[in-house]
Protein backbone atom coordinates (compact mmCIF):
# COMPACT_ATOMS: atom_id res chain seq x y z
CA UNK A 1 0.00 0.00 0.00
CA UNK A 2 1.42 3.37 -1.04
CA UNK A 3 0.00 5.01 2.09
CA UNK A 4 2.00 2.78 4.47
CA UNK A 5 5.06 3.00 2.25
CA UNK A 6 4.91 6.79 2.30
CA UNK A 7 4.85 6.83 6.12
CA UNK A 8 8.42 5.53 6.29
CA UNK A 9 9.47 3.38 3.35
CA UNK A 10 7.01 0.66 4.36
CA UNK A 11 8.17 0.35 7.96
CA UNK A 12 6.60 1.83 11.05
CA UNK A 13 9.32 2.23 13.60
CA UNK A 14 9.29 3.97 16.99
CA UNK A 15 10.86 7.19 15.72
CA UNK A 16 7.86 7.93 13.47
CA UNK A 17 4.96 6.81 15.65
CA UNK A 18 4.14 10.44 16.39
CA UNK A 19 3.40 10.96 12.70
CA UNK A 20 -0.17 12.32 12.65
CA UNK A 21 -1.02 10.04 9.73
CA UNK A 22 -0.12 6.94 11.73
CA UNK A 23 -3.09 7.79 13.98
CA UNK A 24 -5.27 7.79 10.86
CA UNK A 25 -4.64 4.05 10.53
CA UNK A 26 -6.80 3.44 13.63
CA UNK A 27 -3.84 1.57 15.14
CA UNK A 28 -4.76 1.53 18.81
CA UNK A 29 -2.02 -0.93 19.79
CA UNK A 30 1.59 -1.26 18.69
CA UNK A 31 3.81 -4.29 19.28
CA UNK A 32 7.50 -3.62 19.69
CA UNK A 33 10.66 -5.28 20.91
CA UNK A 34 11.93 -1.85 21.98
CA UNK A 35 10.56 0.71 24.39
CA UNK A 36 8.47 3.51 22.91
CA UNK A 37 8.96 6.89 24.53
CA UNK A 38 6.74 8.80 22.13
CA UNK A 39 4.07 11.00 23.79
CA UNK A 40 0.65 9.31 23.71
CA UNK A 41 1.96 5.74 23.99
CA UNK A 42 1.63 3.71 27.18
CA UNK A 43 2.97 0.23 27.89
CA UNK A 44 -0.08 -1.96 28.61
CA UNK A 45 1.35 -5.48 28.37
CA UNK A 46 4.67 -7.25 28.16
CA UNK A 47 5.63 -10.87 27.68
CA UNK A 48 9.33 -11.56 27.42
CA UNK A 49 10.85 -8.91 25.19
CA UNK A 50 7.60 -8.23 23.34
CA UNK A 51 5.83 -5.09 24.50
CA UNK A 52 2.32 -3.88 23.69
CA UNK A 53 1.78 -0.12 23.73
CA UNK A 54 -1.57 1.65 23.60
CA UNK A 55 -1.78 4.62 21.22
CA UNK A 56 -4.01 7.19 22.93
CA UNK A 57 -4.08 9.30 19.74
CA UNK A 58 -5.45 6.63 17.39
CA UNK A 59 -8.51 7.94 15.60
CA UNK A 60 -11.77 6.02 16.11
CA UNK A 61 -13.16 3.74 13.40
CA UNK A 62 -15.93 6.29 12.66
CA UNK A 63 -15.73 10.07 13.11
CA UNK A 64 -16.94 13.35 11.63
CA UNK A 65 -14.66 16.03 10.20
CA UNK A 66 -15.12 19.80 9.95
CA UNK A 67 -13.54 20.23 6.53
CA UNK A 68 -13.32 18.18 3.36
CA UNK A 69 -10.84 18.89 0.59
CA UNK A 70 -11.97 17.48 -2.76
CA UNK A 71 -9.06 16.52 -5.02
CA UNK A 72 -8.30 14.29 -7.99
CA UNK A 73 -6.55 10.97 -7.31
CA UNK A 74 -3.15 12.35 -8.29
CA UNK A 75 -3.31 15.03 -5.57
CA UNK A 76 -4.70 12.86 -2.76
CA UNK A 77 -1.40 11.65 -1.28
CA UNK A 78 0.25 15.03 -1.76
CA UNK A 79 -2.56 16.72 0.18
CA UNK A 80 -2.53 14.08 2.95
CA UNK A 81 1.20 14.51 3.50
CA UNK A 82 1.17 18.30 3.44
CA UNK A 83 2.13 19.97 6.71
CA UNK A 84 -1.24 21.70 6.93
CA UNK A 85 -3.37 18.52 6.84
CA UNK A 86 -4.93 17.58 10.19
CA UNK A 87 -6.66 14.15 10.04
CA UNK A 88 -8.60 14.85 13.25
CA UNK A 89 -10.46 17.78 11.68
CA UNK A 90 -10.36 17.25 7.93
CA UNK A 91 -10.55 14.65 5.19
CA UNK A 92 -9.19 14.38 1.67
CA UNK A 93 -11.80 13.04 -0.74
CA UNK A 94 -11.04 11.79 -4.24
CA UNK A 95 -13.41 12.98 -6.95
CA UNK A 96 -13.41 12.16 -10.66
CA UNK A 97 -14.20 15.05 -12.97
CA UNK A 98 -16.37 16.82 -10.43
CA UNK A 99 -15.97 20.15 -8.72
CA UNK A 100 -12.81 20.22 -6.66
CA UNK A 101 -12.24 22.50 -3.68
CA UNK A 102 -13.30 22.70 -0.05
CA UNK A 103 -16.49 22.19 1.94
CA UNK A 104 -17.03 22.92 5.61
CA UNK A 105 -19.10 20.79 7.97
CA UNK A 106 -20.03 20.93 11.65
CA UNK A 107 -17.88 17.92 12.55
CA UNK A 108 -19.96 17.10 15.64
CA UNK A 109 -22.56 14.40 16.20
CA UNK A 110 -23.17 10.96 17.66
CA UNK A 111 -22.20 7.70 15.99
CA UNK A 112 -23.22 4.36 17.51
CA UNK A 113 -22.03 1.04 16.07
CA UNK A 114 -24.96 -1.38 15.94
CA UNK A 115 -23.38 -4.24 13.97
CA UNK A 116 -19.85 -4.82 12.68
CA UNK A 117 -19.19 -7.80 10.44
CA UNK A 118 -16.94 -8.73 7.53
CA UNK A 119 -19.53 -7.90 4.88
CA UNK A 120 -22.04 -5.70 6.73
CA UNK A 121 -21.64 -2.75 9.08
CA UNK A 122 -24.56 -0.87 10.65
CA UNK A 123 -24.27 2.42 12.51
CA UNK A 124 -26.77 4.89 13.92
CA UNK A 125 -25.96 8.58 13.42
CA UNK A 126 -27.48 11.61 15.12
CA UNK A 127 -26.30 15.08 14.16
CA UNK A 128 -27.93 18.51 14.02
CA UNK A 129 -26.54 19.43 10.58
CA UNK A 130 -25.17 17.63 7.55
CA UNK A 131 -21.79 16.05 8.30
CA UNK A 132 -19.01 14.19 6.54
CA UNK A 133 -18.42 10.76 8.08
CA UNK A 134 -15.00 9.12 7.82
CA UNK A 135 -14.97 5.33 8.16
CA UNK A 136 -11.45 3.99 8.76
CA UNK A 137 -11.97 0.78 6.89
CA UNK A 138 -10.45 0.04 3.48
CA UNK A 139 -12.14 1.62 0.48
CA UNK A 140 -13.17 -0.93 -2.10
CA UNK A 141 -15.62 -0.28 -4.96
CA UNK A 142 -17.81 -3.28 -4.08
CA UNK A 143 -18.92 -1.69 -0.81
CA UNK A 144 -22.34 0.01 -0.94
CA UNK A 145 -23.94 2.28 1.62
CA UNK A 146 -27.59 2.92 2.44
CA UNK A 147 -28.84 5.76 4.62
CA UNK A 148 -32.36 4.92 5.80
CA UNK A 149 -32.61 2.35 2.96
CA UNK A 150 -31.63 4.89 0.28
CA UNK A 151 -28.37 4.14 -1.52
CA UNK A 152 -25.72 6.88 -1.26
CA UNK A 153 -22.21 7.32 -2.64
CA UNK A 154 -19.13 6.11 -0.77
CA UNK A 155 -16.13 8.29 -1.58
CA UNK A 156 -12.47 7.25 -1.41
CA UNK A 157 -11.41 9.24 1.65
CA UNK A 158 -7.91 9.91 2.99
CA UNK A 159 -6.53 7.83 0.13
CA UNK A 160 -7.33 4.38 1.51
CA UNK A 161 -10.57 4.67 3.49
CA UNK A 162 -14.31 5.36 3.07
CA UNK A 163 -16.43 8.41 3.62
CA UNK A 164 -19.86 9.85 2.91
CA UNK A 165 -22.11 12.77 3.64
CA UNK A 166 -24.65 12.07 6.36
CA UNK A 167 -27.76 14.28 6.50
CA UNK A 168 -28.89 16.07 9.64
CA UNK A 169 -31.03 14.09 12.07
CA UNK A 170 -31.10 10.47 13.21
CA UNK A 171 -30.21 7.92 10.54
CA UNK A 172 -29.48 4.24 10.15
CA UNK A 173 -26.42 3.80 7.92
CA UNK A 174 -25.77 0.33 6.48
CA UNK A 175 -22.57 -0.59 4.67
CA UNK A 176 -22.80 -3.85 2.73
CA UNK A 177 -20.35 -5.69 0.53
CA UNK A 178 -21.66 -6.80 -2.84
CA UNK A 179 -19.78 -9.10 -5.21
CA UNK A 180 -21.93 -8.00 -8.16
Residue ranges and their predicted role:
Residues 1-106, 122, 128, 150:
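Extracytoplasmic
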Residues 28, 59, 85-180:
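Active-site-proximal, structured, solvent-exposed surfaces of multi-pass membrane proteins
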Amino acid sequence: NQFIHKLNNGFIIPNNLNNRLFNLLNAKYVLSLRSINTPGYKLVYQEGETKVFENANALPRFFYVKKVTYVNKERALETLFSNSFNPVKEAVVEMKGQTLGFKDYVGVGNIDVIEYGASRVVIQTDNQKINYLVFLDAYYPNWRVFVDNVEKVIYPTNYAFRGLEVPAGKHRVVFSFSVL
